[in-house]
Design a protein with these regions (language model features):
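Bacterial N-terminal signal peptides
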Residues: 6-18
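Conserved short histidine dyad/triad with adjacent acidic residue
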Residues: 49-51, 97-139, 172-175, 194-196
Length: 198
C-alpha cells in the first residue's frame, strides 16, 4: 500500500509540476443521467458537470458512471458517478470514464517502466508481456474507447496505432499505453467492463 501511495504521489507531483495550467483549463464534461420515476415517467436524475482531475495520472480524468454488479440494477436516485474505484471497475462492474490525454513530457517518459502496472496492481491479468513504457498497463477488462477529439498513439507490446477523433478501439485485457505526442490534448471516452482472466 505504501508503494502504491508513493507511485500515486509521484504521478500527482509530475502532473502538478508539468500540467497544472492545462488541467485547470480542461473543460468540464456535461453529464445527463435519466431514470424512470415512481409514476413510470422518464425523467432527468442528474444534469451536471464532471470536473476532470489529475488524481490518478498526469492526465485529467472524470468518472461518469460506475456499476458494481451484474446483471445491472438501477441507482434509485443515488449518484453512482461518485463511487470510488481505481483504474478499473470492481468484480462484475463497469466504469464509464472521460480522459484528456495531455502532451507527454520527458519526465513521464523517464519514469520506471512498471510505474502504471504497479498502480493497477491486483487488477492486472496474470498473462502478458512486461511493460515497455511507464504508462503501459493492462486491466482485467474489456474496454470500449472512442476518441472524441485530438490524436493519440496507443502503444502495444511491439507495435503502436495512431488514433484520431472518431476512431474506436475494443481492447481485450491487452498491454497498452496512451501517449500523446502532439501539442493539443486528446479526449477519449472509455467504458471498462470487468472480464474473466484472459
Amino acid at each position: 500500500m505504501k508503494i502504491l501511495a508513493q507511485l500515486l504521489s509521484t504521478l500527482v507531483l509530475l502532473s502538478v509540476a508539468g500540467q497544472t495550467a492545462l488541467a485547470q483549463n480542461a473543460p468540464q464534461v456535461r453529464r445527463v443521467v435519466t431514470q424512470v420515476n415512481e409514476a413510470g415517467k422518464a425523467v432527468v436524475l442528474f444534469d451536471d458537470k464532471i470536473d476532470l482531475s489529475t488524481l490518478r495520472s498526469p492526465n485529467p480524468a472524470g468518472d461518469v458512471w460506475i456499476t458494481q454488479q451484474f446483471p445491472l440494477n438501477f441507482s434509485q436516485g443515488a449518484d453512482w458517478g461518485k463511487t470510488h474505484v481505481g483504474v478499473s471497475p470492481g468484480k462484475n462492474g463497469t466504469l464509464f470514464r472521460i480522459v484528456d490525454f495531455v502532451p507527454t513530457t520527458e519526465k513521464i517518459e523517464k519514469l520506471p517502466l512498471d510505474t502504471m502496472m504497479k498502480v493497477v496492481a491486483d487488477n492486472a491479468p496474470k498473462r502478458g508481456m512486461p511493460p515497455r513504457h511507464s504508462m503501459m498497463h493492462r486491466t482485467r477488462t474489456v474496454d470500449y474507447a472512442l476518441v472524441l477529439s485530438g490524436e493519440v498513439d496507443m502503444l502495444l507490446d511491439d507495435s503502436e496505432v495512431h488514433l484520431k477523433a472518431g476512431d474506436v478501439v475494443v481492447q481485450q485485457a491487452s498491454n497498452h499505453a496512451w501517449v500523446n505526442r502532439g501539442t493539443q490534448p486528446c479526449r477519449v471516452a472509455f467504458i471498462l467492463i470487468d472480464s474473466q482472466e484472459p
